[in-house]
């Protein structure tokens, strides 16, 4: 090819008559390149345009036939390269960098002639970096036909295709990507590959020989820049040109470009024919390129490490600066605190001195009193100002030290110490405090002495306030127990102060804890209050036994209690008096409930009778009857005489200090002996009138109604002697004789009114229960609106079932009733807790007793119709136990059996006993599923007997030994299949086979067991009589000797009972 040296456009002549013009091959641009670590920089990008051939020019130079086969191997070697653009992508970055030196050469050149030299370098450099093999193939084809270079290399055109976009990738990856596909269809690939040997090899391609003049001019134009830009593989001169340094393109350009271009410069402007590269040179170039790539990767890694190290150092420096600033601020705060404390101590000392001075002066001088206050106030005022001045200097110094750092971009802003004078002075919400205002002290001078005194009091924990405040002494009413909150409220003190005092005494308590009256009194006394102790039982004051005026008392009917032994005719006698038939409705013909009735006397008055059970289990009922009665009628059967319950009734009457009337019943029977009864009563100090005593006696017959009128006359006479009176115009008082839980009516209490009048609507209290009277029912079943003294009625309206024997009273309000019942319920709970505490305290003792004696328990759940019957059953069952077994009542109550009772029985394994009550359907079904036994009784005898039998079954049976006889061992025989057999003679009694025996040697029992075999003359026999000889063998024992004595006895198991 020919290269002209005209200053105008350069023309390349690949063949005669053909002219190729290159116009503006390079375009420059600036791109902002970002890196992964967040940094970015500007990069100058040059775009190289392809030279476009006319369609006729591409096919015109036909070339020699020999050149085609020579060029054929080149596409074969270059074809695989475009198929794998991934590895080739980073390599062709070199062409972009050679374009930059070309641009540098273009800037100082006065003529645009050197500009076309730029496309030759990048296009030729790309295949050199991509793969040396295609580059070597093209020069081999060039010597064969130098003129036909362009057409021959038209086939390997795909090789530059990946090189074109990749060449621009290092410089501007975003901009180069769309440029490549845009120019691909316009420019024929041979045009790009034709000038490639001229710039790539620089050492002699065939194309350079065809245009030596142009090549010389091109190289001479680039000569002033190339030596400066080529500096070996590392490209040290690249950064000085103002282009980007450290990129991959600069390293790759420096390797091969630096080796060949000085040779071109030495040739000057003359066109010469360059020789083709040898195999050694190609290998050396390839190795140089590989070394350049390795160095490039290493430099990248080192640059990244340097960047990371610099970033870490920068962050470390920032942290150190922040820590140093924090330490300085902390030290400043510490200094401020120390100075503040010193000033406070000084001011406190001065205040104390001033106080002592004022105390020594006369109190009557007002002027002298104001002077100390002024002197006291003046030292206090400058103290905050002094504090501000002390702290202001270091604060200002630190502020000045921080200003350069804030200007330098240091983000941390430590808290300015100037805020400390604000807290030291106690200033709040006065606006922002700056260094200037803190040093000037204007804010502090505006504060008053009172505000400073308040701050001082806050600092000292209100000690000064407590000393100066006038104490208000109160009278504190203390019950037996009180909560801390309630105690504090009554003293008008803070609860935390009370808790603090208790903590000083070593008690860790909460505000809701309960303390006793002694502790509360100590606390109240320490706080300066006076104490008045009251008891919780004071709520019951005035509830009972209030005195009545004599003029308000009116006569009332007598209350007569009929007592005596069981089956002595008490209920029959009362039926005869009432003209009723109560006996026929009683189960078993015995009275098991206490009943109250009113009978009209033949003399015109009314008499109230209370019928008590005679069974031994109903002792409590008889005691209650004796307490509420005025007269006791002791019924004694003439044919039976005085019995144990008769004696008990006598003792109850004496304990209640009530007169006694003896009614000798059943005088109509043939074996009646009234005289025997009178004589037996003398043994218990009961002397009737017929025997010179003062006790009235009447011989009656309940069934025959003999002398009933005489009995009523005796009762009336006795009541006249007693002169019974009561005040009906007052709130009612009475006694609960019996109580029960009725399914339809709820809790029902049989009440005997003793004083006052009970009306419907009254609020009543009985024991731990209260309620409003909804209805009053007499003994005949009639409903009444009021009941006066000595009138028995059934009261409906209680919120719970009261206990028999509880006293009833009418209160003025429901609040009072609730207060009383809450107190009584609390008392009941405390008693139960005390009992359980005693049980817990003796638990080890009880368990050791159970282990040692084998004591067993029979758990029971008892439900009865009335509370009195339940009480009697519990008392009777508790008496059944002994040291080995006892009845344990899990639960008891009045009312029917429900599901909760069955669930409790299932949990505790107890049996359920119902006395005159039944279980509902749900309870029966639940008991059937759980296998719980429910036993029903209506006679207390049967109930107690069955429980006794069941408890007797828990007793361990005893064994009883019956001696049968003795035998003496005469000789020992060894028998096969049997072992040792003792030949014996029965000395006394008999010896039976299978009975227990003892082997005695030297009067010591050696063995106890059973007799296994008993033979006589080789025949097995059941027994051997005295004087006969026999053979014996024992079960599992062989150590028998002649002269031993065998004792035979029978063991009998005897079942025990309570």
From Swiss-Prot:
Reported function: One of the essential components for the initiation of protein synthesis. Protects formylmethionyl-tRNA from spontaneous hydrolysis and promotes its binding to the 30S ribosomal subunits. Also involved in the hydrolysis of GTP during the formation of the 70S ribosomal complex.
Full protein name: Translation initiation factor IF-2
Species assigned in the record: Azorhizobium caulinodans (strain ATCC 43989 / DSM 5975 / JCM 20966 / LMG 6465 / NBRC 14845 / NCIMB 13405 / ORS 571)
Positions of GTP binding: 564-571, 611-615, 665-668
Residue ranges with Pro residues bias: 82-95, 109-119
The encoding gene: infB
Region (G3): 611-614
Gene Ontology annotations for the cellular component aspect, listed alphabetically: cytosol
Region feature G1, mapped onto this chain: 564-571
